[in-house]
A protein has these predicted regions:
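Short secondary-structure capping/turn segments at boundaries of alpha-helices and beta-strands
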Residues: 2, 36, 47, 65-67
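Core segments of cupin and vicinal oxygen chelate
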Residues: 7-9, 13-56, 95, 101-111, ...
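Conserved donor-binding loop and adjoining core beta-sheet/short helix segment
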Residues: 41-42, 53-54, 61-70
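Short, flexible domain-boundary/linker segments around small modular repeats
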Residues: 55-63, 188-193
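Active-site/binding-pocket entry motifs
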Residues: 57, 67, 132, 187-188, ...
Length: 260
């Protein structure tokens, strides 16, 4: 279990769900992870549902933007990366070949953010914190534990994020298919990059939540109306599973060693 009051630039710091049915998602995740969910008015009639464990924020549930819903885009978990200057980082991302879908904007007094699509096609968010630093609890059951990019171009993706965020990438010895472990500029492990699987799958950042009972959590996903896409899988140092909530959002579960 690790409490957080700040994040080093380049670190994954928050995740939220864009969904077509907030109330159904609230019921699913509160039962699955024991989240305590608080409805927060976010302007223009929008409710941002903040999820907590033991009084510490861990994630949120938000309504899917109308344009995505009308285009038939499935619900998805978003990955936020803390930066010092979101305006400068968004400009740099564009220079490196990314698409800035939402230029930097203020989120009330919580922070300032931008929505980016990397050159290979994966979406992510840049976050400059004000009153909301991000998750107050990580690497604990029900909390964010890892972020993993599935990409059709490992080298291209690694170079983009190195140039944008100062990350380092290290090939995991003996991994087949290849796997790059990502670290922030100060040397902390921060995620991974792997080939998109199966081939042809659109690139995306997969969000992992920790669990202390993987088999039990997988069973609960199914009992609550979700789908188990990949059951208990031994990856050597941990066990993982990939699942889908009843509205269609994909996320992963992790059971293994957790850093402080």
């Amino acid at each position: 279990m690790a409490e957080r009051t700040q994040y080093t630039p380049g670190t994954f710091s928050w995740t939220d769900l864009n969904t077509t049915d907030q109330d159904a998602a609230k019921a699913f995740y509160s039962q699955l992870f024991g989240w305590e969910i608080t409805d927060m008015p976010a302007g223009e009639g929008v409710i941002y549902m903040m999820a907590a464990i033991d009084g510490r924020w861990v994630a949120a549930i938000s309504p899917q933007p109308r344009q995505q819903r009308e285009a038939g885009v499935p619900p998805a978990w978003n990955s936020y990366i803390t930066v010092e200057d979101v305006d400068a980082s968004a400009t740099r991302a564009q220079e490196l070949g990314a698409t800035v879908h939402a230029p930097p904007f203020d989120v009330l007094d919580a922070g300032r953010m931008a929505v980016i699509q990397d050159p290979q096609g994966a979406w992510f968010e840049l976050w400059q914190a004000k009153n909301h630093v991000g998750a107050g609890l990580v690497n604990a059951p029900g909390a964010l534990s890892w972020n993993e990019l599935g990409s059709p171009d490992l080298d291209g993706s690694a170079k983009f994020y190195r140039d944008l965020l100062g990350w380092t990438t290290t090939a995991l010895e003996g991994a087949d298919p290849p796997y790059l472990v990502v670290a922030t500029a100060d040397g902390h492990s921060n995620g991974g990059i792997r080939p998109a699987m199966p081939p042809g799958t659109p690139p995306f950042w997969l969000v992992y939540f920790a669990t202390d009972d993987l088999d039990g959590t997988l069973e609960k996903v199914a009992a609550l109306g979700g789908n188990v896409l990949a059951g208990n899988t031994d990856i050597g140092f941990a066990h993982i599973g990939v699942v889908q909530d009843p509205q269609g959002a994909v996320f992963a579960l992790y059971h293994g060693r957790l850093d402080d």
